[in-house]
Amino acid sequence: MASSKSLMNLLTFSFGSAIGFFLCYLLFSMILEEQVEIQPHILHNDPHGQHSEDTDNNQLQGQMNFNADSGQHRDENRNIADGLYEKVKILCWVMTGPQNLEKKARHVKATWAQRCNKILFMSSEENKDFPTVGLETKEGRDQLYWKTIKAFQYVYDHYFDDADWFMKADDDTYVILDNLRWLLSKYSPEQPIYFGRRFKPYVKQGYMSGGAGYVLSKEALKRFVTAFKTNKCSHSSSIEDLALGKCMEIINVQAGDSRDTSGRETFHPFVPEHLLIRGYLPKTFWYWNYNYYPAVEGPGCCSDLAVSFHYVDSMTMYHLEYLVYHLRPYGYSYRYDPDSAKGLEEQNKNEAQEDNPKLKQKTSEN
């Protein structure tokens, strides 16, 4: 009798434990699944991938007005930024499509696009309400270079005299125009040059990542558009950034160095956490082999005067807007001297020595 009672207790305990373990497993599975679903950013395995996809979890419903609290910044000294706005005129055009106007482009329009001297949204078809410029192309990744060519042709035909520099960005790119103006202020728009995140495969002088955005000087734009009229360049590839880079090399447009005076990158093909957190990008990831200059992970990855970030979903667009233009630490004066070029000159000298052993030996002898 006692043994039967013990057996019953054992079975009851075992059954209860099994139920408990099952419920715990179910609960943790639901929690982990939810965490995976709300993860806003994933690794993008294509170096030439152009757009992120907003899921239902990270797609913002409605548009935010970040200018509503502008009174809080009325005492802020913007003299330098305002002066550069007049001195370095930038036309921005954003690559988008009919399906992305509400999901992506409207949030670009509500944030950084307001700081362009002129903003255009380029789509396959016209939308007078948004508005967009209709390029009369098809949608799809295989159409990206063709859309880029037609967009720059449209800008050249209609707005060439309205700006000095011409910036192309995606509808999931966040751009800090004030920092871009500082970078460009060191150069003449009559110089054949363009800037962006410089990649190295396939093009001798390198080419600029499409997702991080790139900016052409007035002379570079003129040469690019003319090259298609004279058949120096052609629509020979669907890979937008690489094809444009090859064309730029053919027409002798220089791939500029967009790093700051400390040698840190300003254009970024990913969101900040991918670059700031060591180990986020595995060493087998394509990114490490594509950078023209040695890539850095951790805080040294990114300039204090960063220009752009890519794969920015609609919610992160406003996160960046707040962090860049609204958040201020109390009691600090700006600590960085962007006009001191000694740091980058020294770094370029060291890189030249590493590439040229004879120069390195001569320097050590001196």
Swiss-Prot record:
Bilayer topology annotation: Single-pass type II membrane protein
Chain segments carrying region Disordered: 341-366
Subcellular localization(s) per the UniProt record: Membrane
Keyword tags: Disulfide bond, Glycosyltransferase, Manganese, Membrane, Metal-binding, Nucleotide-binding, Signal-anchor, Transferase, Transmembrane, Transmembrane helix
Chemical reaction(s) catalysed: an N-acetyl-alpha-D-galactosaminyl derivative + UDP-alpha-D-galactose = a beta-D-galactosyl-(1->3)-N-acetyl-alpha-D-galactosaminyl derivative + UDP + H(+)
This enzyme's EC code(s): 2.4.1.122
GO-annotated biological processes: angiogenesis; kidney development; protein glycosylation
GO cellular component: membrane
Bilayer-crossing regions: 11-31
Keyword Glycosyltransferase attached: yes
Cytoplasmic side stretches: 1-10
Annotated Pfam families: Fringe
Superkingdom, taxonomy of origin: Eukaryota
Pathway: Protein modification; protein glycosylation
Positions bound to Mn(2+): 170, 172, 310
Keyword Phosphoprotein: no
Residues where UDP binds: 95, 139-141, 147, 170, 310-311
Membrane topology (Lumenal): 32-366
Residues the entry annotates as binding a glycoprotein: 286
Cofactor: Mn(2+)
Gene Ontology terms, MF aspect: glycoprotein-N-acetylgalactosamine 3-beta-galactosyltransferase activity; metal ion binding; nucleotide binding
S-S pairs: 92-116, 233-247, 301-302
Homology family: Belongs to the glycosyltransferase 31 family. Beta3-Gal-T subfamily.
UniProt xrefs under PANTHER family: BETA1,3-GALACTOSYLTRANSFERASE, GLYCOPROTEIN-N-ACETYLGALACTOSAMINE 3-BETA-GALACTOSYLTRANSFERASE 1
Role this protein plays: Glycosyltransferase that generates the core 1 O-glycan Gal-beta1-3GalNAc-alpha1-Ser/Thr (T antigen), which is a precursor for many extended O-glycans in glycoproteins.
Protein name from the UniProt record: Glycoprotein-N-acetylgalactosamine 3-beta-galactosyltransferase 1
Name of the encoding gene: C1GALT1
